[in-house]
């Protein structure tokens, strides 16, 4: 599928965009999945990122510009999705680290109290 066909499908909507997305999936899934796997290092996370990317392609198809190429545009969406995922994971890891630190401090206080007593 070329960019003009994609733009036409976006304008038509409905089944046309569904067919376009299936064609894009068939053409680009493997490339996008490998990029996702290389970045995220997790099969399920990479698969989820690619699926989410195609959902975003569908939602944002009206923003695609004629002078752009499809694959770089889709890859940019994927990269942004992966960055968001990594930020969320870092926040979750940071919160877990904070919880461990609080627990460690509590335990140190207990042991200090026992040593003094």
Language-model-derived ranges and their functions:
Residues 59-66, 76-96, 109-110:
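Arg/Lys-rich amphipathic alpha helix in sigma70-family domain 2
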Residues 21-29, 75, 113, 117:
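Amphipathic, non-transmembrane alpha-helical scaffold segments
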Residues 48-55, 68-80:
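Structural recognition of an alpha-helix C-terminal capping motif at a helix-to-coil junction
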Residues 3, 25, 33, 43-60:
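Conserved RNAP core-binding helix
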Residues 1-6, 84, 91-117:
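Internal acidic/polar
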Residues 14, 38-41, 52-69, 88-90:
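Sigma70-family region 2
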Residues 1-31, 38:
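N-terminal module of bacterial RNA polymerase sigma factors
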């Amino acid at each position: 599928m070329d960019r003009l066909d994609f733009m036409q499908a976006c304008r038509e909507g409905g089944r046309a965009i569904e067919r376009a997305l299936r064609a894009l999936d068939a053409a680009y899934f493997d490339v996008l999945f490998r990029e996702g796997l290389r970045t995220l290092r997790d099969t399920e996370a990479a698969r989820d990122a690619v699926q989410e990317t195609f959902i975003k392609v569908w939602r944002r198809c009206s923003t695609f510009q004629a002078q752009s190429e499809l694959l770089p545009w889709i890859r940019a969406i994927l990269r942004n999705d992966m960055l968001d995922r990594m930020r969320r994971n870092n926040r979750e890891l940071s919160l877990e680290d904070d919880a461990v630190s609080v627990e460690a401090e509590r335990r140190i206080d207990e042991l200090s109290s026992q040593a003094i007593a």
